Design a protein with these regions (language model features):
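Conserved NAD(P)H cofactor-binding loop of Rossmann-fold oxidoreductase domains
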Residues: 78-83
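Substrate-binding pocket helix/loop in short-chain dehydrogenase/reductase
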Residues: 86-87, 94-96
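Conserved glycine-rich Rossmann-like NAD(P)H-binding loop of the short-chain dehydrogenase/reductase
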Residues: 21-37
Length: 237
C-alpha cells in the first residue's frame, strides 16, 4: 500500500492502521521528518519523501514504493489543501494552489502508480462531502474535489482494467487541515454552515483510519464486488 499525503491526519492514521493489520505500507509526503517519525512509530514501513504535484517526484515515489514493497496493490491519495475565503476575495494564486494539491497531485500520483498496479489494483482518492453541501467560504476546496470526482470517473473509462475508488469524507479531527485558517474566519464559516443545515459532526481521525483500512482491504479481497465509492460521515447527534 502506498499512502500519499501521510505526514499527518487521515493519511498517517490510515498508514498506522494498515501496518497494525499486518500490511506492507510506504508513506509519502513533502515533510521527510514526519515520515521518519511515522515509520518509527509503526515499527515497519518505508518513508518515500516527495512532492506529489511534481511529475518527476510523483513517478519517483511510485517507483521506489513499488520496489520496496514488491509491487503495489493499492495507492491512496489523501493529500489535501483548502482555504476559507469568500469567492469575491479569492485570487488566482489561491485557486492555483488549491487545484495543484487537490487535483493535479491526485492525477499525477494515479498516473505514476498505474504501471505498478495489477489488474485488480486500486487507486483511491479522498474526496469530500462538501462537493454536495456547497459550503460558503469553501468554494475552492469543494470545486477542486468536484473536479477530482470527475477525473475519477474518466480514469475508470480510460483504464477499465484497474479500479478507481472515490472516498467521500466528512469532518474529521484532530488533523492539521485547519491549522492555517484564522480562528475568527473559521467560526464565521461554521456559523454559516450551521445556518444552512450543513452537518457539523466530527469523526475521530484514528477511527477513520481504521475504518478506511478495513474498507479498502475488503475491496482488495473482493474484486468482483463494486466498491467504487466509500463514504464516511459522523453519525447525527
Amino acid at each position: 500500500v502506498l499512502v500519499v499525503g501521510a505526514s499527518s491526519g487521515i493519511g498517517a492514521a490510515l498508514a498506522r492502521a494498515v501496518a497494525a493489520g499486518g500490511g506492507q505500507v510506504a508513506v509519502s509526503a513533502r515533510r521527510s521528518d514526519r515520515l521518519e517519525e511515522l515509520v518509527a512509530q509503526m515499527g515497519t514501513g518505508y518513508a518515500v519523501p516527495g512532492d506529489a504535484t511534481d511529475p518527476d517526484d510523483a513517478r519517483r515515489v511510485a517507483d521506489h514504493a513499488a520496489t520496496a514493497l514488491g509491487g503495489l496493490d493499492l495507492m491512496v491519495y489523501v493529500a489535501g489543501f483548502g482555504v476559507l475565503q469568500p469567492l469575491v476575495e479569492t485570487d488566482p494564486d489561491t485557486w492555483t494552489d488549491v487545484f495543484r494539491v487537490n487535483v493535479v497531485g491526485a492525477n499525477l500520483a494515479a498516473a505514476a502508480a498505474l504501471d505498478h498496479l495489477g489488474p485488480d489494483g486500486i487507486a483511491a482518492f479522498v474526496s469530500s462531502r462538501t462537493v454536495d453541501d456547497a459550503n460558503p467560504m469553501f468554494a475552492t476546496y469543494s470545486a477542486t474535489k468536484a473536479a477530482l470526482d470527475q477525473c475519477i470517473r474518466v480514469w475508470r473509462h480510460e483504464h477499465p482494467d484497474r479500479r478507481f475508488v472515490r472516498i467521500v469524507m466528512g469532518n474529521t479531527a484532530p488533523t492539521e487541515f485547519a491549522d492555517h485558517m484564522r480562528p475568527e474566519r473559521l467560526g464565521e464559516a461554521l456559523e454559516a454552515w450551521q445556518g444552512l443545515g450543513i452537518p457539523g459532526g466530527m469523526m475521530d481521525v484514528d477511527d477513520v483510519g481504521r475504518a478506511l483500512a478495513e474498507a479498502l482491504a475488503v475491496a482488495l479481497d473482493h474484486p468482483g464486488i463494486d466498491s467504487s465509492e466509500i463514504r464516511f460521515d459522523a453519525r447525527p447527534d
